[in-house]
Amino acid sequence: MTDKSKESGSGKLLYCSFCGKSQHEVRKLIAGPSVYICDECVDLCNDIIREEIKDVLPKKESEALPTPKQIREHLDDYVIGQDYAKKVLAVAVYNHYKRLRNGDTTSEGVELGKSNILLIGPTGSGKTLLAETLARFLDVPFTMADATTLTEAGYVGEDVENIIQKLLQKCDYDVAKAERGIVYIDEIDKISRKAENPSITRDVSGEGVQQALLKLIEGTVASVPPQGGRKHPQQEFLQVDTSKILFICGGAFAGLDKVIEQRVATGTGIGFGAEVRSKNETKTVGELFTQVEPEDLVKYGLIPEFIGRLPVTTTLTELDEEALIQILCEPKNALTKQYAALFELEDAELEFREDALRAIAKKAMERKTGARGLRSILESVLLETMYELPSATDVSKVVIDESVINGESEPLLIYSNADNQAAGAE
């Protein structure tokens, strides 16, 4: 091989055989048998090969699958409470990926079935966060779908196969990657049958969607148009095997507690023989959810076939005040840590006092929005401060106490050039 400096002695102008640039337009021109390549094309080739190796080479199978204990420990870092749900999810997810790694059939010829998951719990209890955290930890594609937007094929709304299309989009239409993914279908309780008895009128967003989801969740080869767009006969479809995809369905199931209570209630007779129960015996929604049975879900409006496709059912409890305070402070990406990091970018420290955290938790409890309501409370409390802080000078610390949360006072600003004075005012 020679470079352009050796060839230029002949006086002949040389060009790169790939991009056509002359030897004067590039730093280096490398010669081969009757061909030349410039340094820019070499760099481009290196980039292409590097990208292809990164995308094509699978992860080493020797990499150990995280054990249920390790999965649970990781969930503990991001999700507060819900210990039973974490344990159930850890075991179900571990078994699912162990099945994928070792094939559907054991050495004895036993076929391993797929165990999709149903999460039942009040709003803001951590259903979505659990699914997202699992997918991130396992480094698999993840997508969310809203069951309320789904309709039967042929009606206005989203087709159930759009769920698989979203998953493919997340992994650049790599079918093999998508088949290892996790799909979380939220608001699954909203597609319950409108009446317990089947109606003669079509229920395109309720029972119809459940019927459409059956095969997708159980395992079928879904035909998905590449790069989105509507289906048409001349189009080639991507074939995705959904039997390898883990489906997690979640919903608040408002009113399910009444169905369970009706079933478990004893002494419902009338007259002198009736058993009188005191108010103290009344169970909370979370306690009733733990006693859920398939028959309760059928009565609620899910069809038996659909419930059968979700064999792993776990419930999440309502978050109490102490749990909400922990959520504000303890997880790796806790809200107080997020806002503190934002303030740090403005060279200011953000401090929440203990009474402030309790007041925030109390407000969220009153709103009955669970952990989801915490961010909106903090946003409204810190709005003025976040608006003024970038323009202010010498603010070294912002202190939030209970009176600020209750709207009785403004956040305390401590200035770096008047520390003693600010401390005295405090």
Curated annotation (Swiss-Prot):
Cystine residue pairs: none
Domain ClpX-type ZB: 4-57
Binding site for ATP: P122, T123, G124, S125, G126, K127, T128, L129
Residue sites binding Zn(2+) per the record: C16, C19, C38, C41
GO cellular component annotations of the record: HslUV protease complex
Gene Ontology MF annotations: ATP binding; ATP hydrolysis activity; ATP-dependent protein folding chaperone; protein dimerization activity; unfolded protein binding; zinc ion binding
Keywords: ATP-binding, Chaperone, Metal-binding, Nucleotide-binding, Zinc
PANTHER family: ATP-DEPENDENT CLP PROTEASE ATP-BINDING SUBUNIT CLPX-LIKE, MITOCHONDRIAL, ATP-DEPENDENT CLP PROTEASE ATP-BINDING SUBUNIT CLPX-LIKE, MITOCHONDRIAL-RELATED
Subunit structure: Component of the ClpX-ClpP complex. Forms a hexameric ring that, in the presence of ATP, binds to fourteen ClpP subunits assembled into a disk-like structure with a central cavity, resembling the structure of eukaryotic proteasomes.
Function: ATP-dependent specificity component of the Clp protease. It directs the protease to specific substrates. Can perform chaperone functions in the absence of ClpP.
NCBIfam families noted in UniProt: clpX, PRK05342.1
Name of the featured protein: ATP-dependent Clp protease ATP-binding subunit ClpX
